[in-house]
Amino acid sequence: YILKAKEAFNDPNDPNFIKMKNVNAFFYFKDDTVLEVFSEKGIYNNKTLDMNFSKNVKAAYEGSTLTSQKAEYSNSNNFLQISENVKVDDIRGNFTAEKLYFDISKQTLNIASSKKGKINANINIK
């Protein structure tokens, strides 16, 4: 991955944490695809390599876009969690949810909603 920010500051309370503003992250996968993530704020743990993105999070992957208010990539626990007003737009359809939880090692996705367990989805079936 490559992690960039317009501004970055060491956390005075913990030197392992770097607070960032206007963050861009690029995750490169073995199949030559790239996930790009942008947020207004972020925190990087230079010991565990974990990343937190917050405020107007936007992501793009192979023509799909995602927006939310929070995203957490845990390198140490092998998961990616997207939360708070999650919206996904794709050529195959779109949906909104409260939280997405990707278990990277199991390659599973859990979609959660606080609206009586329901998500709003429109799927294009051909």
Residue ranges, per PLM feature:
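Mature-chain termini and adjacent capping regions
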Residues: 1-126
